[in-house]
Amino acid sequence: MEAITKNGSLSQTLVHCGPKSLSSFIPVRCLRFSKNPFPKKLVVTRARTSINSDHEAANRPLFQFPPSLLDDRFLSISANQSEIDSLGRDIEALKAKVSEKLVCMDVKERIHLIHLLVSLGVAYHFEKQIEEFLKVDFENVEDMNLGEEDMYSISVIFRVFRLYRHKLSSDVFNRFKEENGDFKKCLLDDVRGMLSFYEASYFGTNTEEILDEAMGFTRKHLELFVGGSNEEHLSGHIKNVLYLSQQENAEVVMSREYIQFYEQETHHDETLLKFAKINFKFMQLHYVQELQTIVKWWKELDLESKIPNYYRVRAVECLYWAMAVYMEPQYSVARIILSKSLVLWTIIDDLYDAYCTLPEAIAFTENMERWETDAKDMPDHMKVLMRSFIDLHEDFKREVILEGRLYSVEYGIDECKRLFREDLKLSKWARTGYIPNYDEYMEVGIVTAGIDMTVAFAFIGMGEAGKEAFDWIRSRPKFIQTLDIKGRLRDDVATYKDEMARGEIATGINCYMKQYKVTEEEAFLEFHRRIKHTSKLVNEEYFKTTVPLKLVRIAFNVGRAIDTNYKHGDGLTYGGIVEGQITSLFLDLITI
């Protein structure tokens, strides 16, 4: 479960910085590159403990984690149910007006509106309508693009179709090239077009060279545009997109940012803006209620008085993670299920990584495999943790039993056991000083990335996820496998330094250095190259997958949650990385 639980630092990346005022929509982000070079060292050769040590307990791999973001600011907030009900009525009234717009517009205008609905976080209200329109419109897309020379428009059309799994050819961008293959100089005069073209490049696959070129070309010039003579709100929007593209960012964060940007656009649609603001406030109040539920559950669990303080308490951070997977209000129960699971997975991951001895890790894994509350051969605190974990799943069963979906929880339990078996292998490597080669490491690492388990638990609270959805995960489809690899790579880069500090020398970076005889710097550069390559594979498999779009999107969003939390460091361990985003969702309620 490392892909959601560890820390590290990442050189040569954009970092999030700026004021954290509660009066702003989201903290300003600015561009800053690390000046710290990678040390040119080779592999650490031995861990500090041995499987035969007589002093296992004395040599626990203790590690001091930073505190949670959950403080009095979050504990004091509340949501008024009457306000939620009132906002719900307003949403229904405005929804009808927006739906009319979708029907009455011509094809190109409608696609631009769909792009706005997605960016503002309200497209989920019209998903069936949108899918039906785009299915028909895609058949006539060549006529739609004929003679179109506006880069912004072409990029928006490209992004919308690809988002809804229609693979519009990237050849549409050839019109923006000179005969010598360079992009036309006149494109630099269209800042919004350049930004949209940059966003479009994130939908590329490994066979689309023009989108690789577009990403480099547009990013280079967008960085120059920031702080230039452009409008302040446009510069701020560019900063946000350069920090995380819409394709990488959590939808809920992207929507919050885009609403602020759109409000300051001169020609914004007042009805659409009002609808987006009311809808976002409606969602925020649901999130506040969910946080209250999770905090209440955590306090009643009272693990802090029952087990040693070796772990991270990450209630608000785990809910933020779940919100990145699905933001819609109708998935409140699903978010709570996923959040509670994430909270306990994090503690169990810390048990394996940062506290238990090897005999304890073996006993814990064997008892989890039996799935019985009368655990044997374990310290009392581990028995308490195991009972809490099993009891949580009994709660989940009660939640889904009336829907006839007990299989969803049973499948989730199987995924947990699979993960714990692989976690034990990592523990053995760490405690015995074994450094596998990279290929051997990845066989374990793609499981401990936790993607399969996270997708499975994300489906538990979704009534529309039937048995076939879980069978799909069990079949280990290539789409999920590529997400596994991407999650593993992101985690390995972000958590490397902390893992080494804990004596976990069998890290992805270290194993790669060992197998290929390269320096740390070279290993990091290769991992970044592989992340980019794997992101394109994810896109390719997204287009190929025949599972219902809603379910594929949830799995895809698990990958976005990885990007949101790990692209610029370990946001789950070091909450300051994502504090601005979390603050903007829970504490800075949007003003209507």
From Swiss-Prot:
It catalyses: (2E,6E,10E)-geranylgeranyl diphosphate + H2O = (3E,7E)-dolabella-3,7-dien-18-ol + diphosphate; (2E,6E,10E)-geranylgeranyl diphosphate = (3E,7E)-dolathalia-3,7,11-triene + diphosphate. A motif (DDXXD motif) lies at residues 349-353. It is found in: Plastid, Chloroplast. Residues 1-52 form a transit peptide. Keywords: Chloroplast, Lyase, Magnesium, Manganese, Metal-binding, Plastid, Transit peptide. GO terms for molecular function: magnesium ion binding; terpene synthase activity. Its EC number is 4.2.3.167, 4.2.3.168. Pathway: Secondary metabolite biosynthesis; terpenoid biosynthesis. The Asp-Asp-Xaa-Xaa-Asp/Glu (DDXXD/E) motif is important for the catalytic activity, presumably through binding to Mg(2+). This is Bifunctional dolabella-3,7-dien-18-ol synthase/dolathalia-3,7,11-triene synthase TPS20, chloroplastic. It comes from Arabidopsis thaliana (Mouse-ear cress). The lineage of its organism: Eukaryota, Viridiplantae, Streptophyta, Embryophyta, Tracheophyta. The gene is TPS20.
